[in-house]
Amino acid sequence: MYRDFIIFALGILTSFMLIIIFGEIHDRYGNTPSNREKRKYIEDRIKEVHDALKIAFAEMKYTSRDSITDNYCEYAKLQLEWLNSEDVMCHGNVEDVMRLRRDCLDLFASNKNRSLRSVVLEDIDDITWETNRLSSTYDYKIKFYTKAYKIYISWLNSNDLLCESTSERELYKAKLEKAILHLQSIR
């Protein structure tokens, strides 16, 4: 009788422990969004940021107050940091991400009275420098930057405003192609 009670008590304790353990596992891993939900969130946020940047361009065109333009530039800087996040690189559409990146860079250029050309070329320099330090453990970054570099090359080919001369265009295209080869060799 006493042994049956101990077995019964151990069975109840084991049941409670399993319920608690499975509850913790579900809380930790069960509430993470799926890849589809992450993609949807990123698409929605990109649309919201595009809308905010349109408003920023319109306001900057009609006002010269430094506080407003500085706030919009700070906002664009935060969005550029978000565009470099792991979730965006893994689940975001590269074309949409790069279009938003270009809009943010355009906002910086107009705020700092610099040409879009100098800001984009500076961004290319920064990104190629960053990817030269990548290792094979960052597979999502390698895939993202490979596609992003191809988009940068198409920008250079399609927009005469980004480069002052053909030699400068070819120099940056060669730099990007070298970076693509470097990323492919890491894989």
Where are these regions (language model features)?
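Short amphipathic alpha-helical heptad-repeat segments
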Residues: 41-52, 68-79, 93, 116-124, ...
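Transmembrane-cytosolic junction motif
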Residues: 21-40
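Repeat-associated, polar segments at repeat-unit boundaries in modular proteins
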Residues: 79-121, 159-187
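Charged, low-complexity interaction regions
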Residues: 57-70, 87-95, 133-143, 160-169
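Feature marks short, highly hydrophobic, charge-poor N-terminal signal-anchor/signal peptide-like helices
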Residues: 1-10
